[in-house]
Amino acid sequence: MAKAPRAGMVKTRLAPSLSPEAVTAFYCCLLEDTLALARSLSDVEVAIICPDSDVNELAQWIGNEASVVAQKGEGLAAGLTSVFAHFAEGQQRRVIAFNSDSPHLPRSVLEAAFETLAAHDVVVGPTHDGGYYLVGAKASHPTLFAGDGMGTRSALERLLSRARALELSVGFAAPFYDIDVADDLIRLAAELRIAPARAPRTARWLKECELVAAQSRTGTGKL
């Protein structure tokens, strides 16, 4: 799931730390690395689900890397529902939905999530703040997401409650974190200094930002 990379419309919680232009450039890197991660999996179809108003812009930007599909309705819950509805039409049996907030997610986590769906109706990847970064299912369940998205502090609890109400078995992917606020960005930068290949475009952008910041502190450049 994604949005078109427009200033002031993406990763807004990073705005206190970065300029709108920097946030947008960072988001582009996240999206490119996430798309590369998805495409690195074997025998999968990759689609980007986005608001209808973003389809043309994203399609031009992505090119032939993936299909771009308009979600039905507004908000993250509608986006999640649209993911599973889209793939249900094509008879794909195991579907994983995630956004561009975790481009450094190990591919093994996605592979394990698909395997989990062999034994469960739903798979979910928890975050440490009560949300989730990934959700998968073997069929479309229109009421599973009912009004909330992935990032709220009670999102995971509500998702599990609805899964129980629908009598769906749930398996879990490894806990992980996504990039929402400045502390997440600092953590990501530290990890990518050690292993830049996990998200090469994002790692390169972060390194360039660090160089600019260092030049600014020494009076040899400016932000």
Residue ranges and their predicted role:
Residues M1-L14:
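N-terminal nucleotide-binding beta1-loop-alpha1 segment
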Residues A25-V44:
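A short, N-terminal amphipathic alpha-helix
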Residues D43-S67:
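Acidic donor-binding segment of Leloir-type glycosyltransferases
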Residues Q60-V95, T152:
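Short phosphate-binding loop-to-helix
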Residues F98:
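Catalytic metal- and UDP-sugar-binding loop of GT-A-like glycosyltransferases, i.e.
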Residues P103-G130:
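Conserved donor-nucleotide/metal-binding helix-loop-beta segment in metal-dependent transferases, i.e.
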Residues H141-R162:
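Short, glycine-/small-residue-rich phosphate/pyrophosphate-handling segment
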Residues S161-L223:
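Conserved alpha/beta core of the MobA/IspD/sugar-nucleotide pyrophosphorylase nucleotidyltransferase superfamily
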